[in-house]
Amino acid sequence: MASGREIKTKIKSVQNTRKVTRALEMVSASKIRKAQDRMKTSRPYAQAMKQVIGHLAQASTDYQHPFLVEREQVKRVGFIVISSDRGLAGGLNNNLFRKMLGEAKAWQDKGAEVDLVTIGQKASTFFRRVKVNMVGSVTHIGDVPKLESLIGVIKVMLDAFTEGKIDRVYLVYNRFVNTMVQKASFDQLLPLPPAEKQVAHHDWDYLYEPDAATVLEHVMTRYIESLVYQALLENVASEHAARMVAMKAASDNANKLIGTLQLVYNKARQAAITQEISEIVGGAAAV
């Protein structure tokens, strides 16, 4: 059995660790509400953009934007993978990466090649170690991400799709369901899935200048950027929720370990006292 001093040292070490996990839990709890607010605030913009594109697509029946045209054969697939910059978020990132590798292998088994751009330090570090062709990366996105920091990697995929180098693009991220549940999601980004036809609730039509096709050309890129940005906000909220839950579990485990070590310490102390008493009694009897 370890000595009382060694056990006390272990207890002190676990208590210090518990202070860190509790602090991280409280920080994540305070950040998650702000992240949820940003996520909810951005949703109406993406929904409005989707409606506008639906109107524009119907107004320009003689023109189909390249982002709306399905390719007959998929020879190369692109993925935009979003992760966190920091760890200590349970299995949030690893679960996403494992599913991403499975999806990439499935396409490779079909004979398609895979290209990847990553958003977030964890994804960048992980996929540089595996046999996946990374064509772009951005890190240090922070808790309040800016759209400007994403435009570069988004453009890499948009240009590749426009030039015919990539036939399909997926957006991979952790969708925020609630504080306890975050779901790894694979959304098809390009070509855009067919939008539902807009039902007219009025007797007038829209007038586009110079024409619907030109407006659609400008709006489409903004819409793609808004989808990636929305996914990033979902992932940030998921990160804080996962970290809060993971740190709470770590704090609870620390409490259990401290209780166990305290019990061991009490038994060791009791055994030492019993030994001392036995020695005193034995010495007195000898006299």
Curated annotation (Swiss-Prot):
It is a peripheral membrane protein. It holds the Pfam family ATP-synt. The keyword Cell inner membrane applies. GO terms for molecular function: ATP binding; proton-transporting ATP synthase activity, rotational mechanism. It is found in: Cell inner membrane. GO terms for cellular component: plasma membrane; proton-transporting ATP synthase complex. InterPro entries: ATP_synth_F1_ATPase_gsu, ATP_synth_F1_gsu, ATP_synth_F1_gsu_CS. This is ATP synthase gamma chain. It comes from Stenotrophomonas maltophilia (strain K279a).
